[in-house]
Amino acid sequence: MVIGMDLGVGLPSTIPAATGVDILAWAREADTLGFASLGTLDRIVYSNHETIPTMAAAAAVTSRARLTTAILITPYRGNGALLAKQLATVDSLSGGRLTVGVAVGGRADDYQATGTDFEGRGKVFDAQLAEFDEVWSGEVRGTAGAIGPAPAQAGGPPLLIGGTSKAAVRRTVEHGAGWIAGGGGPETFAQGAERIRRAWSDAGRQGEPRFAALAYYALGPDASVLAESYLHDYYAFLGSYASNVAASALTSRAAINDDIARFADAGCHELLLFPCSPDLTQLQLLADLTCG
């Protein structure tokens, strides 16, 4: 399939039934099948595997696919210097394959569980982004020099900022290599991407911002059941709106092909398709459709 867009697949790390063995098997197989990238979702109060160790483990069992956090919620992780060191470590371990999608997140329970300030998360996020720039540029911090290891990618792994607020647009222009959409389909993505393009140009940034997006998929005779079961549970915090999220899952070959084409037409550079089941059959079905 020639689409002019990188097609990645999410790891099943937020599916409660997925074991560590399942996640690593999925990473190996996706790397072998030719997917451009592997993605992770992020939250605290749920039965998911934590994002940064999962990415490090995926780096160890793959050699080609990029690793994209889609997204990593950084404010409740606190110290920006430590987080910069952790991300630089994953970038080093992966040989420079890390892309860091970051945002403030919208679930208050994650902040309550970590003892961090939900209302003040934007201010913390701004400070962290500035800290990333400083640490990854090699700024001297003490008698031993800079905080290492140096990222494998010069200047640090590319940052894709998530969110649709004015602050998110500002952060993308000030600190990002681009923007990552948090779902909503191709039309919502296109609207957000156009806002970023205008702000990017107005700020005098050179080149083009990188754009990424995500969608959920399930294939096979039980596709709708798999999507409804997982997404209703994962998005239960949204109340009745969880049904809308479940209904948006791509559950047919035609729906997947259509969304891929529409995202590509809207200027998306990387689309991550996240599974609703950790069964490797789901990965093979997607590869049969997209990697041929």
Task: Locate each region found by the language model.
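Active-site-adjacent structural elements that line small-molecule/cofactor binding pockets in enzymes
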Residues: 1-292
